[in-house]
Amino acid sequence: MDTIKSEELECFRKDKWLVLDTRTKEEYNSGNINADYNFDYYSPTFAEKLSELSKEKNYIVYCKSGGRSSKAMSLMKELGFKNVKNLEGGITTWIEKGFPITK
């Protein structure tokens, strides 16, 4: 399964999964899910920034609703990342379910 639900995120974090926000810096600064990284999917340096990450670690990617992050997940898998999952519904669903954000 390549997606996880909002309710599952904390369990994955406890197992040392890292969180990558693929939204713009402005979106990130307006509130995020305590992300470990913020790499704008639309940035021309997105793939270059991904190459700086360890392909052996586990990552959960998210965006506003899941579109950008699903594309980012596909790219990461193409680049050889072993474990990548997409947060279903992105930060929009996260907020709708009442989970906290960091500003």
Predicted regions and their residues:
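Rhodanese-like catalytic fold shared by cysteine-dependent sulfurtransferases
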Residues: 1-18, 25-58, 64-103
